């Protein structure tokens, strides 16, 4: 309904915030739900969307995170300013597939987010592992090797090779246990 929102309300009419506050780990009161973002044209033009051969989508979070990292804030109103309808073939419906099919943009987004948020090494390792698992167990046409995963996510190649060995060992152990 036009009067319902998935957004968590707050008690002020608006809030000035960094777009990094969309992430739970960055803020005690993250900006959640569906919100409309409006930017000055001059600012948006300053932050170009990176392009990668063979990829036709990159999450807008790449440019938003860069703006936030450079100190820009947005004013978020606690009011419904737009009404939308999810489309069966829209971005939300395509879920993780849009990232799997565009691994360089996906890796750039995750790598920069970790850098801008000063993620500790252990958290980066979890992110690298998840990226590796997602991009090595997907449809054959989109599958990456360990070296590509390392390059796109900014991880040490040796870590990715260790992940490959660990996954093979785990799969072999599962087969043995099933017998």
Report the location of each language-model feature.
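Conserved phosphate/oxyanion-binding catalytic-loop motifs
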Residues: 1
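Conserved nucleotide-sugar donor-binding catalytic segment
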Residues: 4-93
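C-terminal subregions of glycosyltransferases and related glycan-biosynthesis enzymes
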Residues: 62, 74-179
